[in-house]
Each structure stands twice: as structure tokens, then as C-alpha cells.
């Protein structure tokens, strides 16, 4: 049963974001080949035109377009052939009226010409005469000087995540290095007397650490650096020391375990000990992920995550990812969620008063995408392995019906 006083995830997130200090993240300068998916820290203004000259988009002949007007296969035009444009060289000639110059794809348009006619529409008559079988208009088959980027134009704006094509544009205007925001550093602390490392033999009552490896992959995929602080016993002073150290060498602190009510619940108390404002919420109207703790200490977000793997992944998506966006330099800009539209293949129930995040697998059948619920408790890692994404059931709904269209947030 969910307490109606619990915050919805979006409202809980807003408490953390609003409590964080303002200011720009630190920056660094990188070669463009190392800047993929990094966040630009400054606007990039081109110091030159791209292209730096008018050039042909096809193999053909540079001409005065007017000399071809009316030309067709049954009534061709005839032009003298006197010059040839060479790749990588500026033409040292001018195309006079009534003449053409042979030009390759990418070749610089010679002075006097204003269009290029394709090879397929030209018939050689002799070494110095060609037959034009189709007319062209001024600018046909030509990329003009500065048509792609003009000198003084803002090519990329600060706060943008660099894609491969953006890096190509930088290279095209001669930019070889770029100022970007530094990757945020996230410390992760695993707590629990029952947690052991993956290479340890299991004794009765013990489980291997799953969450630190899952979160490390998620953090890396989202432009940050994860520092795993190891496994800390359920001891107040040990956990406090680990959090204190993490606040000194990282931008965000994540603690796994110690969030459910019980004798060994120390996370909230320790966060409050770290300084104002401390814990901002303890528990959210969410499944899985109800025991989530959110706070800010020493100007840095400190989050207590549920120990169940599925809950950890959901909480990363709802809380950690948006906060990382801010720390990465995206500020309050919305991030793009990879999603697909699908049709629910089966009914799925949900309790009233909470936001339910259902793991689903997606299959294509008869030309449409179907979303199949992946059933299982949030402590089962295989429910994530078998799933392709999440479908959100809003707090106001009691479930989803088979045949209902849904949005699947892809992992």
C-alpha cells in the first residue's frame, strides 16, 4: 500500500535539482577526435566559409547556364571545349561565353561559369566541341561558396552533446580542438553485511554485488566517471567516513542499500549529518524504487538507492540521469529519451496511488511492435536482462489493457 503523502518521482527530483548550487561545471580542451558525446562549453563560430569556394557536385562540364537554354536531345546546343579543372587546384582560366570546361566532382568552379552539366547529358563531338542534350539553370549541380557554413555563423551552441556529424563540421571549418565540460565524477558505495564481490565464494545468506557494476555501465554510457568505493559493512562510522571521502573527490554520491525502514537504516541519518539541507525526501510513490532517498550535502547530490537491481535501474533513469545532465553542462535542458511506440500484448495491473514502471520486452509481429510484460520481483536481475525497456503506468491508472498503445522507454 502506497502512502498518499509520498512524492511523485518528478516532484522528488525537483527538490534535489532546486537545492543544487548554480554555476558552470569545470571545462577542459580536447582534440575533436576525443570529443564524441562530450558537452560543448562555448559557442563555436566559424572563421571561414564552408566550402571556401564554389564547387561541382557532379562529374561534368562547367558552363554559362544561358548557353544551354533550350537545349534538348532533338535540338542540342554546341559549346567549345578548351579547359579542364584539376582536383585540388584553383583554375587559372576563365570560361568564356560559348565554351565549357571539363570538371570533376568537388572541382572548383572556374570564373565565368555558373552551372555544371552532367556527363550523361553531354555528347562529345570532337576534342574541342561538345553537344549539350539538356539545359541547366544557374547554380545547377554547384555548391556555392559558404552555402554550407558562412563566415561568422554560429555552427554549434554551448550545451550541445557532440555527435559524429558535429565533429565532422568542426573539422570542415578547421577547428581541431574544442572546449567541453568535464565529465562528472560519481562515487558509488555498496553497503550491507550480506554483499560480497563477484569473485568471492558465497556463504549462506550472502549475495554478490550487482548494482555497482550495473550503475558503472549506466554512468559511463551517460557521460560520467564512476568510482566504486567498495563494499562497506552496515556500520554507521564506516559508512559516514565513506560518504565524507566521496563528497571530497566526486560530484555526486550514490549509496546502495540501507534505504528501507529497519534497524540498520542509517543512510538518511548520515546524509543529514553531512550538512544542510540534508535529506529532502525519503520514499517516493514509485514501483520499483519506493525506498529511494534524495538529499543534498555540501552542495552535492547524495542519493540512497534501493538494493534491488530493477529498482536501481529505474531510479537511475528517473533521478540520476537528469541530475547528471545538469552536472555535465546540459543545465535544465530536457534530454532525449530513446523510445518506441508499441502495443501492449497482455493486460497488466497496477495499484492505485503510485507510478509503476513495468519491464517489457519488445517483439515485432505482423508488422507491428508488441510490448510483453516481463514479470518478476524487482530483486531479480533477469527481469532486466530479458527486458528491452520500461513502460510507465501513471499514478492515476489501475493498469494497462492488451491492445493499448504505449511508449516504451528503451534501455
Regions found by a protein language model. Give the residues of each.
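Helix-rich terminal scaffold detector
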Residues: 1-10, 176-305, 309-315
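Short, glycine/charged-enriched hinge/interface segments at domain edges or termini
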Residues: 2-4, 9, 62-233, 370, ...
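Conserved active-site and cofactor/substrate-binding residues in soluble primary-metabolism enzymes
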Residues: 4-11, 27-30, 34, 48, ...
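Intrinsically disordered, low-complexity, positively charged segments
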Residues: 5-70
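Flexible glycine/proline-rich
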Residues: 10, 23, 28-33, 42, ...
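Short, hydrophobic/aliphatic alpha-helical segments
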Residues: 35-49, 90-102, 294-295, 299-301
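Solvent-exposed alpha-helices and their adjacent loops that cap or buttress functional pockets
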Residues: 54-56, 71-74, 92-96, 109-111, ...
Amino acid at each position: 500500500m502506497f502512502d498518499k503523502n509520498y512524492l511523485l518521482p518528478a516532484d522528488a527530483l525537483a527538490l534535489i535539482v532546486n537545492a543544487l548550487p548554480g554555476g558552470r561545471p569545470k571545462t577542459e580542451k580536447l582534440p575533436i577526435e576525443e570529443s564524441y558525446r562530450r558537452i560543448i562549453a562555448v559557442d563555436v563560430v566559424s572563421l571561414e566559409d564552408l566550402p571556401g569556394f564554389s564547387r561541382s557536385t557532379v562529374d561534368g562540364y562547367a558552363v554559362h547556364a544561358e548557353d544551354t537554354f533550350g537545349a534538348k536531345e532533338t535540338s542540342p546546343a554546341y559549346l567549345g571545349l578548351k579547359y579542364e579543372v584539376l582536383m585540388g587546384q584553383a583554375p587559372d582560366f576563365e570560361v568564356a561565353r560559348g565554351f565549357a570546361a571539363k570538371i570533376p566532382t568537388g572541382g572548383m568552379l572556374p570564373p565565368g561559369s555558373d552551372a555544371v552539366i552532367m556527363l550523361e547529358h553531354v555528347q562529345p563531338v570532337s576534342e574541342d566541341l561538345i553537344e549539350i542534350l539538356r539545359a541547366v539553370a544557374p547554380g545547377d549541380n554547384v555548391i556555392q561558396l559558404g552555402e554550407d557554413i558562412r563566415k561568422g555563423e554560429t555552427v554549434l551552441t554551448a550545451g550541445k552533446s557532440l555527435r559524429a556529424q558535429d565533429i565532422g563540421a568542426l573539422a570542415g571549418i578547421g577547428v581541431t580542438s574544442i572546449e567541453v565540460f568535464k565529465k562528472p565524477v560519481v562515487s558509488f558505495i555498496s553497503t550491507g553485511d550480506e554483499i560480497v564481490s563477484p569473485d568471492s565464494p558465497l556463504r549462506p545468506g550472502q549475495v554478490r554485488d550487482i548494482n555497482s557494476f550495473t550503475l558503472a555501465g549506466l554512468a559511463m554510457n551517460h557521460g560520467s566517471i564512476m568510482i566504486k568505493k567498495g563494499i562497506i559493512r552496515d556500520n554507521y562510522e564506516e559508512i559516514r567516513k565513506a560518504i565524507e571521502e566521496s563528497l571530497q573527490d566526486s560530484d555526486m554520491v550514490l549509496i546502495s542499500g540501507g534505504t528501507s525502514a529497519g534497524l540498520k537504516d542509517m543512510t538518511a541519518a548520515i546524509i543529514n549529518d553531512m550538512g544542510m539541507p540534508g535529506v529532502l525526501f525519503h520514499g517516493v510513490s514509485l514501483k520499483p524504487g519506493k525506498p529511494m532517498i534524495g538529499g543534498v550535502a555540501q552542495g552535492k547530490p547524495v542519493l540512497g538507492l534501493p538494493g534491488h537491481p530493477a529498482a536501481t535501474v529505474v531510479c537511475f533513469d528517473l533521478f540520476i540521469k537528469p541530475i547528471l545532465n545538469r552536472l555535465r553542462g546540459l543545465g535544465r535542458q530536457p534530454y532525449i529519451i530513446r523510445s518506441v511506440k508499441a502495443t501492449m500484448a497482455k493486460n497488466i495491473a497496477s495499484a492505485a496511488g503510485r507510478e509503476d514502471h513495468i519491464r517489457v520486452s519488445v517483439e515485432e509481429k505482423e508488422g507491428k511492435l508488441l510490448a510483453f510484460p516481463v514479470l518478476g520481483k524487482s530483486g531479480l536481475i533477469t527481469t532486466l536482462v530479458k527486458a528491452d525497456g520500461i513502460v510507465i503506468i501513471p499514478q492515476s491508472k489501475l493498469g494497462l489493457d492488451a491492445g493499448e498503445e504505449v511508449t516504451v522507454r528503451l534501455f
